[in-house]
Amino acid sequence: GLPTGMFHVEGLELVGQISYLKSGLFYSDASTAVSPTYAEEITTPEFAYGLQGLLSGLKAQGRLVGILNGVDENIWHPNVDQYIPHHYKLKYMAGKKKNKAELQAYFNLPQDESALAFVMVTRLTEQKGVDLLIESADEIVKQGGQLMILGSGAPHFEQGIRELAERYPQNIAVKIGYDEALSHLMVAGGDVILVPSRFEPCGLTQLYGLQYGTLPLVRKTGGLADTVVDSTSESIKARTATGFVFESATPEALRHCLQRAFALWQKPRAWAMVRTDAMEQDFSWRKAAEQYRTLYERL
């Protein structure tokens, strides 16, 4: 076994017991989290579950590093995606409109090109902010938009979104479960992809949205905060805007963000600019791999 001398606060011990998680962190040369913001968040009591002192120390020493996940462009790219009926790319976007029509037809919603189409592919849990969407989805209906949801999870959330679809059959549709091909079509055919998570270490859905020109609407947390730049007049002018971001985990904050998305939708040229800038972002594994190599080379 391990030497008894290792069982102390500067070793294996955590609250009188052996913690293998703490031990691994303590004795490692470096640890990685899946985004820079999450690496900061886990140094706080809210996220660290008693390890905030250790994690804060590691962060200060440069031994805790946040590196974002990457997107596999052989699977998730609108010009090669095997699951979508119409391929497209940045300089030729006609396929995106066709995918939108296919998606609307699949969900039996009006095939209206002018309707702002929101999509959400997720586990139906509180962490994913599903309750926030249920309480603010009427804003999408009020403004003539569409909402399509794919996912499964907590029974009361499944029931909640079913009730939304029953109440607004011309605007909201849902499929309970998971369907790989449909998830790709939703990312390709939507205009906005919703990721209103309460916490999100990295998140991949918003990265797929950027890749496909489906603007992410996200809460400012974890990897979502690192990957999506809010569309303000300043950021749009600076060509840095890539989506929509809200801060408070409340239905009111999400509702206001939805309103801002509709406002931008009414400005086609500005929308196209943001979409272009979103699609030009590089969140490939090439970029992530280079960051890992840089870290490993300095150990």
Where are these regions (language model features)?
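Catalytic cores of nucleotide-sugar-dependent glycosyltransferases that transfer UDP/GDP/TDP-activated
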Residues: 1-299
